[in-house]
C-alpha cells in the first residue's frame, strides 16, 4: 500500500531504535513518509540502507536522547532496558513509543521509570510482519495517555492501516499477548486440519482455497496459504519468539486466574519443534511436525496461491 501523502509529518523529530526484520520495515515507511528520523541499530550495517530514504543512521544511542518521539522495536525486555538506559543517559525525549512484545510487568516498570524522568510513554505493540508492513497493513494496539496517543497517531498511520487505542496503563500489552496466543493456537489448528484434509485425499491448495473463501477465511489464513501449499517457510516469526509469547499468555492466565488449556497444549507443541532443533525456521513449519505425527511426507504442490496482501 503506498504511503498517503496527506499523512506526511515533519513537525516532530523522531528517533528509532532497532532495525531488525520488523524495525527496519517500520522505519523505512517513516523515512519514505517524509519524517525527520534518526535510526540506531546494534549492527549499524543493517540500518545503513535506510539512509537512501532520508533517514540519518547514527552511531551512538545518545544521539537519539533529545528527539521528540523515540520509537523502540527490539526483541526482548532486557534489550529494551539496555537501549533505553543508554539512550536516556544524557538527555530525554518528550515521548517513548515502545513497540516490542514484552510482559505487563516489564512495561509497567518502563512506564514508572520514564514517568520519573518526565517522559511520556506509550505501549504500542503491533500485529504483522515485515511483508505486512511493506504492504501497508500493519496495525497497532496502544495504551497510555490519550494526549500522547493523539501526538503519535500520525506516525502510526504512516506505518500501517491504523491503530486501536485501548486505554491507560498496560492494556495494550494484554491485547498483544492475547493476539499472539491466538496466533499460536490458530496456526496449529490450521496445520491440523490441512493435514487431515490431505491425508483424506485432498490437495492442500484445494482445501485452503475453500477455507479462504468461506466464513472461516481471514487475512492470516490467506497470508499463510502459500507457505502451507508450497512449503516455502521463509522466516516471518520464529518458534522461539512464539514460545516467548505463549509463555507471556500463560503467565497472564495465571495472574488473572483464566484457564488456557489450548494455549498450554500449543506451547508444548512449539516446544517440541524447538526440541527437534527447528529454532530458526518460520513457525508455520508446525505443518511439517503435524505431517510427521500423521505418518505422511509432504511435497511442495507448486501452485500459484495468492497471499491476500497485494
Listing of model-derived features with the role each one plays in the protein:
Residues 2-72, 94, 298:
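NAD(P)+-binding Rossmann beta1-loop-alpha1 motif at the extreme N-terminus of oxidoreductases
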Residues 37, 57, 121-122, 163, ...:
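Hydrophobic beta-strand scaffold residues
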Residues 61-117:
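Rossmann-fold NAD(P) dinucleotide-binding segment
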Residues 101-184:
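Rossmann-fold dinucleotide-binding core
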Residues 171-294:
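Helical "substrate-binding/catalytic lid" subdomain
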Amino acid at each position: 500500500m503506498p504511503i498517503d501523502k496527506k499523512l506526511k509529518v515533519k513537525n516532530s523529530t523522531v528517533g528509532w531504535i532497532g532495525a531488525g526484520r520488523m524495525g527496519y520495515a517500520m522505519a523505512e515507511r517513516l523515512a519514505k513518509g517524509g519524517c525527520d528520523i534518526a535510526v540506531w541499530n546494534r549492527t549499524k550495517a543493517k540500518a545503513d540502507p535506510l539512509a537512501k530514504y532520508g533517514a540519518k543512521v547514527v552511531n551512538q544511542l545518545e544521539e537519539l536522547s533529545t528527539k521528540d518521539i523515540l520509537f523502540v522495536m527490539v526483541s526482548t525486555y532486557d534489550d529494551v532496558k539496555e537501549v533505553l538506559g543508554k539512550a536516556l543517559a544524557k538527555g530525554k525525549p518528550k515521548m517513548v513509543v515502545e513497540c516490542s512484545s514484552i510482559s505487563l510487568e516489564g512495561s509497567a516498570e518502563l512506564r514508572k521509570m520514564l514517568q520519573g524522568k518526565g517522559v511520556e510513554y506509550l505501549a504500542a505493540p503491533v500485529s504483522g510482519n515485515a511483508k505486512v508492513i511493506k504492504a501497508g497493513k500493519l496495525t497497532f494496539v496502544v495504551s497510555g495517555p490519550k494526549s500522547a496517543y493523539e501526538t503519535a497517531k500520525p506516525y502510526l498511520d504512516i506505518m500501517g492501516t491504523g491503530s486501536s487505542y485501548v486505554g491507560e496503563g498496560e492494556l495494550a500489552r494484554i491485547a498483544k499477548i492475547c493476539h499472539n496466543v491466538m496466533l499460536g493456537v490458530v496456526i496449529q489448528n490450521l496445520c491440523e486440519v490441512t493435514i487431515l484434509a490431505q491425508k483424506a485425499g485432498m490437495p492442500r491448495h484445494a482445501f485452503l482455497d475453500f477455507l479462504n473463501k468461506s466464513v472461516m477465511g481471514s487475512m492470516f489464513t490467506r497470508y499463510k496459504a502459500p507457505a502451507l501449499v508450497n512449503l516455502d517457510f521463509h522466516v516471518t516469526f520464529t518458534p522461539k519468539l512464539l514460545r516467548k509469547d505463549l509463555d507471556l499468555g500463560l503467565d497472564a492466565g495465571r495472574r488473572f486466574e483464566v484457564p488456557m488449556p489450548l494455549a498450554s497444549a500449543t506451547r508444548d507443541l512449539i516446544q517440541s519443534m524447538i526440541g527437534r532443533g527447528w529454532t530458526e525456521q518460520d513457525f508455520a513449519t508446525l505443518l511439517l511436525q503435524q505431517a510427521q505425527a500423521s505418518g505422511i511426507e509432504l511435497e511442495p504442490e507448486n501452485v500459484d496461491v495468492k497471499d491476500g496482501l497485494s
